Structures are given as C-alpha cells and as structure tokens.
Amino acid sequence: MQDLYMVDSIVSFGVEKLWKLLSQEYERFQGVEEQITELRDDLKMLMAFLSDADAKKQTRALARNCLEEIKEITYDAEDIIEIFLLKGSVNMRSLACFPGGRREIALQITSISKRISKVIQVMQNLGIKSDIMDGVDSHAQLERKRELRHTFSSESESNLVGLEKNVEKLVEELVGNDSSHGVSITGLGGLGKTTLARQIFDHDKVKSHFDGLAWVCVSQEFTRKDVWKTILGNLSPKYKDSDLPEDDIQKKLFQLLETKKALIVFDDLWKREDWYRIAPMFPERKAGWKVLLTSRNDAIHPHCVTFKPELLTHDECWKLLQRIAFSKQKTITGYIIDKEMVKMAKEMTKHCKRLPLAVKLLGGLLDAKHTLRQWKLISENIISHIVVGGTSSNENDSSSVNHVLSLSFEGLPGYLKHCLLYLASYPEDHEIEIERLSYVWAAEGITYPGNYEGATIRDVADLYIEELVKRNMVISERDALTSRFEKCQLHDLMREICLLKAKEENFLQIVTDPTSSSSVHSLASSRSRRLVVYNTSIFSGENDMKNSKLRSLLFIPVGYSRFSMGSNFIELPLLRVLDLDGAKFKGGKLPSSIGKLIHLKYLSLYQASVTYLPSSLRNLKSLLYLNLRINSGQLINVPNVFKEMLELRYLSLPWERSSLTKLELGNLLKLETLINFSTKDSSVTDLHRMTKLRTLQILISGEGLHMETLSSALSMLGHLEDLTVTPSENSVQFKHPKLIYRPMLPDVQHFPSHLTTISLVYCFLEEDPMPTLEKLLQLKVVSLWYNAYVGRRMVCTGGGFPPLHRLEIWGLDALEEWIVEEGSMPLLHTLHIVDCKKLKEIPDGLRFISSLKELAIRTNEKVFQKKVSKGGEDYYKMQHVPLIRYNWPQEPENNEVIYSFPSPII
C-alpha cells in the first residue's frame, strides 16, 4: 500500500526547488526561453511519478535507481541554471562571456530534458504510476504552510514522565551526601538519562551548593585533552579559548578542584576505561567535587551511586503519548479526538518497548498528522514491519524501536528531511550553533525566507528547528533573552538513523580516518555532493582537493587542532558552502583561487591563521554569510571588496586591518548582522542604508569620528535588536576619551525602537545612563563594562526597565551609590556586580525584585564583602535570591576577553 504520509521525499523537494528557481528567474533566460519552458514542463511531469516511486523504493531496487538518477539530474540542472544566471548577471545582454554562449547552454538544458524523458520512460516500464497534479509545488507548499501554521505548545517538552520523583532524590545525593563521589545514571539509549541529568544540573539547589559547574559530552572517540579543556573552560571562562598543553590543563584543573566545590557532568561515557583515562585530573576529595555520569553501561565509576531509570510503565507511555500526540486539543477550538484514533495510538505505543524517546518520536509523528486515514497508514506500516520482520515481543529487541525512529524521519516534509540530514553531519553530541546552521541551510536552498512575509533566514531556520523540537527529533530550548533557539543537538539514536538515511540517499560523506577508503584522496570519484571532515590530520599544506560536483565542504575538527589547506580551490568549482574554521595557509595568504568559487554562498574563516585576503574575493557575489573573525594576532590585509557582495546577510570583519583604504559597505542593503564595524576603517554614514540590521557591533575609533553622526545612523536602524559599542584596541580614546565620547547618551528617540540588548564598554559617560536606558521598552539585556559610566551615583526609577532580564555592572570604578526604586526592573532574572571598587552597598530596592534568581558579586573590598555575606547587614536585601555566587565570575586573564561578542561573562 502506498504510504501517503511519506510522499514528500528528499528527491521531490529537490525537483520542486529547481522548478521554483526556473519560475522565479524566467525573465532572465533570454535566448533560451524555449528550452527553459520545455524543462519546466518535463519537471512537472516528473513530479507526478515521484510519489509512487518513493513508495516503492524500499522493495524495488530499480525504483531506487530511478530516484538516484533523478537526484543527479536535478543537481546537474541546478548547476547549469545557476552558472547561466551568475554569468548572465555580469552582462545581461550577452552570454558571450562564458564558454559556448547561448548555444552551449541551450544544448545542456536540452540534454537534461532528454535525461528526464528517459527516466520517465523507465519508470513507466516498471509500472510506476503517475499522479495528476494541478501544480508542481502545490503539495509541498500546502504541507509546509500547514506545518508552520501549527501551534506549538509553550510547555517544556522535557516530559519527565516516570522520572520526576527521582530528580529530588539524586539532587540530595549530590548536595547532601559528602561521602559519595557522585551519581552514575545508566541504562538503554533513549531512556532519558541525559534529560534527567540536565534537570539535576539546572536545579537551584545544585547551582547554589557548588562553586562551579561543568558539562562535557564524551563521544566514543574522544581525546583526553579536549575533555579536560572543555571542563576547564566551564569552570574558569578565561581559559575557554586558550591553547594550553595537556599537562598545563591538568595542573590547572587539579588546582581548581583542590579548593572549590564543583559538579562535573560526563554525558554518554561508554566504558570504564574511558573514565580511567579522564580521572587523573581529579585530586583526592578535599573541597567536595562530585561527578554526575550518564552511560549505557553499568559500573563506569566504582565509587559512584548507580541509578538505573526504569522503563516506562504502559500507563506512563500512554500518558506521555497523549501529552504530545493530542496537544491540538489545547490549541485548536473544536478539535475532537476520534475514538478509533485513540485505540490505534494505544496499540502503536506498545511497539515503543516502553522507551521514552520512541514514545516521544511516535507522538511527534502522530501530532503532525490530522486524519484517521493518515494514522491508519502509520499503524499499518508498524504492524507490517513486525509481521514481515519477525520482531519479537522481547523488550530488549530494538528492531521495532528503530522502525519507529525511522518512521518519524520518513514522516517529515522533504525540506525538514534535508535539515535533519545536515544536522547528522556534525559529530556525536556536538552542540550546533543555529545561526550558522541557518545560513548553511540557506546556501543549499533549504530555507525560503521569501515564503514568509518579513521573515529573515534566521527566522525561517527558527521555525524549522521548532518543528523538529516539537517532533522530539532535536534537542533544544529557546533562549530566555533572545526567544530563539541558539544551539541544538541530535539524540545519538536519532543521529544513527539519520546517518543511515544519509547513506541511502548518498546525501553526504564523512571523513574520519585518514587510512580508510573514504579518505580525501578518494573524493574525486565520490558521487556525494557534501563532504564533512572530522580528522583534519589528513591534510598537508600540499594537498589540493578535487571534486567537480562537490557543493558543501565542512571542516569540523574533533578537538582544537588546526589544519593546513592547499593552495588551489579551482578543482571545487560548484561549492556553495565552505567552512574553513581553524585552517592554516602557506605564508598566511588565502589563495586567490578562492575567487573562482562563484557559486559560494557561505564562507567561514573563523579562527583561521590568515594575514592576507586576496582581492579576488570580490568575485563571490552570491555570498550570504561571510565570517572573517580571523585569529592571527596580527593586522589583516582586507581589500575593499565587499561593496559588490549585494546578497550578504551576515558579515563579521577582522578586529584590526593593515589596509589603509576604507571599506565601502553602504551597498550592503540586505545585511542583518554586522560584527566589528570599525569607525576607522569604514564610514559611519554607510550604516544609514543598512535598515535591515538586527545585530551590530561597533569598534569605536577617535580618528575623525563625530558621535552625532553615529547617533543619527543608529536612529535609522529600526530593526536593530542587539548593539555593542566597544573601543578599537589601538584607539586614542584610552588617552583622550573626550575626543570621541559625548558625556551623555543620546535621547531615547535616537535609539532603535526594537533594541533588546545593549553593551557599552569604555564609554566614559559622565551622566547617569539609566534614565535613558530604562525608557527603552524592549531592552532585555544591559551591560555596562569598564568605565562605561564614570559618575558617582546611579538611579533606576520605579517603573523603569519593564522587560529587563539581565543586568551586568562590571568595573565602574567611580560608582559609589546605586539606588533601585521599588517597581524598577520587575522581571530581572540575573544581576552581576563585579569590581565596582567604590560601591558602598547593594541597592535596598533589590529586595523588591521577586523575579531575581541569580546574583553574582565579586569585590576585593573587605567591608563590602562582609555586608553581603550571609549574616551581614545587607544580606536581607538579597536573601530571597535562590542562587548567589561570591567572587564570581573570575577575573579575565587579559583585556582580550572584554572584546568577545556578545558578552565576556559566561
């Protein structure tokens, strides 16, 4: 039986995407209109066969072959079309500028049409049926719009059904039992071990009991240095990006743990030998450090209390499934649950083997389907798998569980399948930055901001992540400050399923072992269009990669090692995505051949060792994302090439340039994120036209800057949400601050109305900034660092800062008195008061802020310390705060920490 809920395949999504490209750009195909029209008609006919072909691919090898050929045809056609459009944009009236001109392109398109006709003939001979369609993209577009209209529950989806009672018990074991080394949570994959550990880690009692907390995911192939470095960075943020030798890391960890109480979580340890490799970092238990382990295996740590979560009872399974699959009851007026659907759901739940992850995934799959017919198809598929596959009723048999996981993938719309397969390209337990991921998806054409009025690439990615979280396929939570999903992870079982699907679809190739058959030297013959490299040791400076069809190349070093790249990109002509984070280049020069990659839409050189960028970068006119936050410790030669990159949405510039020519950025009208915009290297007036900016980091220099001009520019940025103003490292304002800074902030009307985050560093304001800032009604984060204000008195008035969530006051050397009136900052959650040397007391008004959950205080002033300590005369003002940290965060090792973005405080 054809599985109607599975027809939105990866192949059909690719065909739809190509058809959409041809339709949207039709007017630009001058001279080849006839061939383009024929190709569109052929694609429409082809789409009609895909539903039946996809339904038969599991049992018919020839059907699978047809789908693979269609995928290759789609890729080849897209390459031809994009070359035409890119070359044609240089000279709209003439195609003589690229080989063969119109005639060659026409022949290539005709060849594609012939290949489509041939594969259609083969499918007809195989008995694959055609569906009548009104429009090639009608099904997928309607499905996508329906999915995105679906209302997502605002409740936490941690769904600790059956585990709630254990959280308090294990928290007490960690904070109340001084004799134990910690807790080891063991059991099957998908049992909820990590979910339980996270609930414990985030518990208020745990946060207030321990001086420091660290969380590290331990993959099957880990290095001890990387694990130790992650822990050290968690416990002492100043070492987060350091490159210390392993012995030094061990020594510093040993010293920290000798004197501080710390809880360290090791998530997903595989065997006891792994623990013994890591253990030398721990001193004998003096200060009270403890560990919390999760593992599929028992007896990982010989001295930990072992806790084994039980499988859910059948009643708990049903309760959990109801919470997810029937969530529409709460959100859709008049929604009625069919009794037959309830009966089927109960029966399907039995095949989840009482495993929480399987129940959640089944619930997410059912929740996305609205009709009895769709639910019957899912039920029949599960039952047929059990009958045909001979799945046993043994609860240790994972076959039916894996089938539920596989079904949850197959039930996704095609665009979400692409998204999920991309997530699988990252290493096990890897935390994926969603902002960067959103641009990778956009570069591959997965996201369609144009379909959603006013939406950005990041907005659409957030919608997609929300869908995957709702279906319990991705682990992520919205950030309390940004209301976005900032990072995400794949559950390891779901990742295993996705890797199998990626292999079936020839979606990507992962290189991990330099000695394997999948090494870099075999890439020229690879049919995969996407390559991910974990083991960067396979590269030497002489290696040049060759693959004429490769679209995406990601380097994700496991650990912190750098790698050398070759000098030639010419053999990778069709790349859309190139991630070179941490790469080293001969002589510090990025090869000029980078300019040959005219299809490139995503380029990252974050932390790369580069001192010279070639002028050929100007050829990369299709770039959406360009990250040049290079870590060379030297001045960087940055040519004036950005003015031609009109599609840019994200631009991160180096900290310091060696070039004297100003960068012209005024043409970048589509920019949404601009980092390290220097008033020395660029004209502030360029900002006037960047009206779509949402995030802006400005490096202030005193050379010719008029602050009125800057204020005027900022007032034009109506969509700006996140603003950081920081002095350039070599700026003259350190000697003569008044050459740059005005004594007060501009009036409220000069600030962007949507501003949610503002960070001021070394601004030397003489007038209290709070009366202005508290009137910015969208502000959620305010950071005043290092003499941002140099006055004696600061006042937060009642009713001010209505949505403020986080306030950081760091290094205001002159501040003596701070008044917080009752009713000010009613939603404040986190407050940091750090190194304000003359501050006499904490504000009395803090006792009225019932929302305050975290207070960090660091000072060397003995009198102040005594006042705020437990039992001190000021303690009553803060005793209602669940988590109070003293002498935290630690002092940055040097001023470089100040300039991290968006915040130096972890």
UniProtKB/Swiss-Prot annotation:
Keywords: ATP-binding, Coiled coil, Leucine-rich repeat, Nucleotide-binding, Plant defense, Repeat
LRR repeats: 572-597, 599-619, 620-644, 825-850
Domain of life from the UniProt record: Eukaryota
Coiled coil (residue ranges): 20-59
Keyword Membrane included in the entry's annotation: no
Record-annotated NB-ARC domain positions: 138-452
Binding site for ATP: G187, L188, G189, G190, L191, G192, K193, T194
InterPro entries in UniProt: Apaf_helical, LRR_dom_sf, LRR_R13L4/SHOC2-like, NB-ARC, P-loop_NTPase, RX-like_CC, Rx_N, WH-like_DNA-bd_sf
Leader peptide range in chain numbering: none
Pfam families referenced in this protein's UniProt entry, alphabetically: LRR_14, NB-ARC, Rx_N, WH_DRP
Molecular functions per Gene Ontology: ADP binding; ATP binding
GO biological-process terms attached to the record: defense response to other organism
Keyword Transcription: no
Disulfide bonds: none
Domains as described in the record: The LRR repeats probably act as specificity determinant of pathogen recognition.
Role played: Potential disease resistance protein.
Family: Belongs to the disease resistance NB-LRR family.
Protein name per UniProt: Putative disease resistance protein At1g59780
